[in-house]
């Protein structure tokens, strides 16, 4: 327990908060180039083939990012935009690729929650 004099001389240090997405370097999004696009399996008890990409960012980091939605057009050398946000059942995946920007196409035939998947509003069917 420090004395009051010790606290005056040298005040307590605030505990630094560790960021959950260090590769973004305090930016909301970052641009990057896909170096590898592949599928991986989730932790127990889930079972699937999750689509992910290894992305080299403009900040110099190389991270693994999740590709949300059904179907995608990404391949090696595609330029993508990533945002923060982890995937709970994929260890080490702390970023999401933003659909509908740069080389990433939006999800086809999506009717609900379109803004999250970069899909334009569908034209109404003619009668």
From Swiss-Prot:
Record's superkingdom?
Answer: Bacteria
The UniProt entry's sequence similarity note says: Belongs to the universal ribosomal protein uS12 family.
The terms describing its cellular component in GO are: small ribosomal subunit
Q: Which gene encodes it?
A: rpsL
Where does the record place Basic residues bias?
113-127
Function statement: With S4 and S5 plays an important role in translational accuracy. Interacts with and stabilizes bases of the 16S rRNA that are involved in tRNA selection in the A site and with the mRNA backbone. Located at the interface of the 30S and 50S subunits, it traverses the body of the 30S subunit contacting proteins on the other side and probably holding the rRNA structure together. The combined cluster of proteins S8, S12 and S17 appears to hold together the shoulder and platform of the 30S subunit.
Question: Could you confirm whether the keyword RNA-binding appears in this record?
Answer: yes
- In this chain, the stretch annotated as Disordered covers 102-127
Q: Which organism is it from?
A: Nostoc punctiforme (strain ATCC 29133 / PCC 73102)
Write the protein's name. Small ribosomal subunit protein uS12
A Gene Ontology BP annotation from the UniProt entry: translation
Keywords noted in UniProt: Methylation, Ribonucleoprotein, Ribosomal protein, RNA-binding, rRNA-binding, tRNA-binding
Per UniProt, subunit arrangement is: Part of the 30S ribosomal subunit. Contacts proteins S8 and S17. May interact with IF1 in the 30S initiation complex.
Q: Which residues carry this modification: 3-methylthioaspartic acid?
A: 89
Q: Does the keyword rRNA-binding apply?
A: yes
């Amino acid at each position: 327990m420090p004395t009051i004099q010790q606290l005056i001389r040298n005040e307590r240090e605030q505990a630094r908060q560790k960021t959950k997405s260090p590769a973004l370097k305090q930016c909301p999004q970052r641009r990057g180039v896909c170096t590898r696009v592949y599928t991986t399996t989730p932790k127990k008890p889930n079972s699937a083939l999750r689509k992910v990409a290894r992305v080299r960012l403009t900040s110099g980091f190389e991270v693994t990012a999740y590709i949300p939605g059904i179907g995608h057009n990404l391949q090696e050398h595609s330029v993508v935009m990533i945002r923060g946000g982890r995937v709970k059942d994929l260890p080490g995946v702390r970023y999401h690729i933003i659909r509908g920007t740069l080389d990433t196409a939006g999800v086809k035939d999506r009717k609900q929650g379109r803004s999250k998947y970069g899909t334009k509003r569908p034209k109404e069917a003619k009668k």
